[in-house]
């Protein structure tokens, strides 16, 4: 894997760009879906805590 990363850096026409500028619209859509999934997981965990009877 490190060789692939070095190769990408070596052939990058503009190495000064950061990752956010390299993203394609599909990459941005994937990030949005991942963020949405993270929110759903977070909400589900909170709801599960509320439904769980408190142990005393």
UniProtKB/Swiss-Prot annotation:
Belongs to the ubiquitin-like protein UBact family. There is a cross-link at residue 56 (Isoglutamyl lysine isopeptide (Gln-Lys) (interchain with K-? in acceptor proteins)). One of its GO terms (molecular function) is protein tag activity. The modification Deamidated glutamine is found at residue 56. It comes from Yanofskybacteria sp. (strain GW2011_GWA1_39_13). Keywords: Isopeptide bond, Ubl conjugation pathway. Coiled coil: none annotated. InterPro entries: UBact. This is Prokaryotic ubiquitin-like protein UBact. The keyword Nucleotide-binding does not apply. It comes from the Bacteria. May function as a protein modifier covalently attached to lysine residues of substrate proteins. This may serve to target the modified proteins for degradation by proteasomes. Residues 1-28 have a biased composition (Basic and acidic residues). Residues 1-33 are annotated as: Disordered.
């Amino acid at each position: 894997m490190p060789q692939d990363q070095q190769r990408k850096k070596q052939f990058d026409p503009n190495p000064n760009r950061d990752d956010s500028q390299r993203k394609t619209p599909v990459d941005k859509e994937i990030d949005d879906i991942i963020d949405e999934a993270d929110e759903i997981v977070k909400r589900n965990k909170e709801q599960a805590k509320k439904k769980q009877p408190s142990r005393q």
